[in-house]
Amino acid sequence: VLKVRPDLQVLLTDVDTSLHMNNGRYWTLMDHGRADIMIRSGLWRAIVKRGWVPVVSAGQIRFRREMKLFQAFVLETRILTWSEGHVVMEHRLLSKARDGKPVLNAIALVRAGLYDRRERRYVPMSRLLEEIGLEAEPPQASPEVEAFLRAEETLKSAA
């Protein structure tokens, strides 16, 4: 499963009045992680050519450790599993402790898909895989992913 891992740093534009990363900035960085996967996989060409629109339908985040101004970190983005029209992705923001050991600052799960405006539906995963020349079956969803998807369905029915 494709995974991207760019090196980043908390900048002045990322922080709030406490000089740690603003909660909303995490989501923006995760948008960049998803775009990075689309570009590196070659899917971006098809997205532009066919007028597909990336859409996030659900997300859940757990903040574990604050990220301070100028702190270096890595954003890991990977696809965990998929259904017919959506993928579930994991985003992990990791920094290093003083002893060099990795620190998990935040972790998020996101459900997303590519919407075809002409067809008025989400693009099937089989079509997306075909566009990038892959054949694959979705990995088994972990208990955490299953719980996330159940919670998303519950919220969806309440809306």
Feature-to-residue mapping (PLM):
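Active-site helix/loop of acyl-thioester processing domains in fatty-acid/polyketide metabolism
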Residues: 25-48
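Catalytic strand-loop segment that frames the active site of acyl-thioester-processing enzymes
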Residues: 1-33, 143-159
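Short coil/loop residues immediately preceding or within conserved phosphate-binding loops
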Residues: 5, 56-58, 88
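Short N-terminal edge-element motif at the start of the domain
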Residues: 46-53, 69-71
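Generic structural detector for well-ordered beta-strands
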Residues: 7-11, 62, 111-113
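HotDog/MaoC-like acyl-thioester-processing domains
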Residues: 67-74, 78-159
